[in-house]
Amino acid sequence: MNLGHETVRAELTDEEIDALRARFWLDDAILIWLKKHGVNSNWDMTHAHIVATLWMLLEQYKADGHSLDDIVIESMADVCALGRRLQGYAVPDAAAVMERLAGAVPDDAGKDDVFAYLTKAIEASLGIAAPWSALDSPLWQLHFEAFQEWYFGDELYEQTYGKAPYAPGKEGFLRREVPLGTAEGIRRMFQELKRRGYALAIATGRSRMETAVPFAAYHWDEEFDPRHVATYTDVDEASKMLGLSLDKPNPFAYYAGAFGTYPERYAEYVSRPDEFKDGEYYIVGDSMADIWCAKAMGAVMIGTLTGLDGPAARAMFEAEQADYIVDSVEDMLDILK
C-alpha cells in the first residue's frame, strides 16, 4: 500500500528481522494471543494483523468525512488504489492492533470465530460490508501469496505455484531456518522411536514444499513413509475436494498423517475416523491447536515448550490437562519407552 516512507529490502540481517518482528508483533504478544485462539498458520496470523490495521485506517478515513461505500479489496490494483487514498493517515502500531483484536474477540473464541467476530465488529464500526476480512477472501489470498514470495524466494515460489512472483528479487527465508533442536539429534530420535516399534507420522500446517526443503536438508525425510506426512497442501486439497474447512484445529491433518494421505479415504476420515484407528496415538506439539486436536482424536498429548511462549506455555498445557510436558521434542524418548 506504500504507506509510510520506509524502504523495503529483500535481504535482511537476523538482527533486522528480530527488530521488525518485535515492532510489528509486539514482542510476539500478538502471535501468542492468536495461537491461544487456535489461529495457527502464518497466513491467518498475518491476515488478522492486516485486517485490524485496515479497520483502524478506514476509521480515520471515514472520520474525515469520506465515503466507504466504494471500498473493494480484491486485487493488487485495489490494494494500491486504497493505499493512495489512505496516504497521510497514521498507521496503527502493534499495541493498537493488539488492543483492537482483544477488544473485538471474546477470550473463548476459536479460530473461525476470531474472524467472524472481527468481521462483525468492523461492519458495525464502519457501517459497510467487510467481506475482505474473512479467511480465504481475495485479500487473504493476496497475503498468502505475498508471504510465500518472501518465505520461498523467487525460485521455489515459481516452482511451487507455476507463476513468477509479483515482486521478484528474494532469496527466501525458508533456506535460513534452523530446527528446534539439533538436526542430527532429532534424526537419531526418529530412528530410536522406530527401533522401539513406533510408527511415525507428521501433521503440519506447513505446505508440502515448506516441509520438503528442511526435511531433505536434514535427511529427516529418510525416516518417514511419504504417505504419512500430511501437510497444509494435503489438507487444502481435501478441503476443496470435500467442500469442508479441515485445517487446524480440525483433527483432519492428524488423521491423514496417521492413516495415510489417500484421497479416496478422506471423506471417511471425516465421517468415520474411529474405523481407521489401530492402537494408541501420541500427538507431540507446542500449540493450543495441537491440544484440541489430540482431544478430538482421543490421543495422548505430549506438549513441548519449544513454541512462542517457551517455558511459559507450561501453564497452558497444565490448564488443558496435557498428558505430558517436555522441554524439548527430543525429551519424548523419556516417555515413549
Go through each PLM region and give its residues.
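Substrate-recognition "cap/lid" segment bordering the active-site pocket of phosphatases
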Residues: 163-170, 174-187, 191, 201, ...
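Short acidic-hydrophobic, aromatic-tinged amphipathic segments that line or gate anion-handling sites
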Residues: 230-231, 323-332
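Short, compositionally biased "basic patch" segments
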Residues: 126-165
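A short acidic, often aromatic-flanked loop/helix-cap motif at beta-alpha or helix-coil junctions
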Residues: 29, 235-240, 244, 330-335
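Conserved phosphoryl-transfer catalytic core
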Residues: 1-128
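Short, charged/polar "capping" segments at the starts of alpha-helices
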Residues: 209-212, 309-314, 334
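Acidic, Mg2+-coordinating phosphoryl-transfer loop and its flanking beta/alpha structural elements
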Residues: 205, 280-324
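Substrate-recognition element of Asp-dependent hydrolases with the DxDx(T/V) motif
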Residues: 72-73, 82, 89, 97-138, ...
